[in-house]
Amino acid sequence: MTTLAKRSNKQIYRDGDKLVKVFDESFSKADVLNEALNLARIEETDINTPELLNVEKLEGGWAIITTFIEGKTLEELMEENPDKEDEYLEKFVDLQLKIFAQRAPHLNKIKDKMHSKISASKYEATVRYDLHNRLEGMKKHKKVLHGDYNPSNVIVTPEGEYYVIDWAHATQGNASADAARTYLVFTLEGKTELADKYLKLFCKKADIAMQLVQQWMPIVACSESIKNIDSEQELLDSWVNVFDFQ
């Protein structure tokens, strides 16, 4: 097997026409099976995704085995062709809107997930109370949400087909939550100009008021804070202030 990526808690390999993602012991069996189940449910939609082939216990931990998708990530293409950034961003947003048009009624609900994240966060009770109330006031939708939609999770094949990978955080609910999450990812990567360009383009194409996406930003920032990444905390703390986007 060829090693494609090594992270602190998982390793990704290519084995011929298969991709093997091996999780360490910090991932419970339930976590791994949930990610596999998410992918299986997304396979039933019209979105191009890798095909789930197997889930098995290996020496290094539980593993998810899928088809390997040949190509480059959209992030790589944007870095290699900066003059085409706007063109790629258009494709990126169009694909996100296609995801939102899908339905997968058995996915977990975004509100349930976010309530759990808020409760587990480090913030004091008054802040958590305000965040819970803000979340409860959001409109309930049933759109498919990726949960970590960014250019590194979109693969473009040599034939020009677009595949979306890594559905570990998929839920169903309000599209503005997923847009806020994408905006946050760009911002945390230091790509503030791209983040702003993305948000404006998304709101225009989706015909969604920017304020509706901004209302989710304290909530998604709180959920991200659970990871306890020191370099992110100052920015996340500033976003979690529930008065920032009133």
Where in this protein do the model-derived segments appear?
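An alpha-helical support segment within catalytic cores of ATP-dependent transferases
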Residues: 101-147, 155-158, 163, 235-243
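Activation of the activation-loop gatekeeper triad in protein kinase-fold domains
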Residues: 166-170
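Short beta-strand micro-motifs within the conserved protein kinase catalytic domain, predominantly
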Residues: 51-62
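Conserved short submotifs of the Hanks-type protein kinase catalytic core
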Residues: 60-73
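Structural motif at the C-terminus of the N-lobe alphaC helix and the adjacent alphaC-beta4 loop
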Residues: 37-48, 99
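Helix-rich C-terminal or lid/interface subdomains of diverse kinases
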Residues: 181-246
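ATP-binding glycine-rich loop module of kinase domains
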Residues: 2-33, 40
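Internal "kinase-insert"/substrate-recognition segments embedded within catalytic cores
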Residues: 83-110
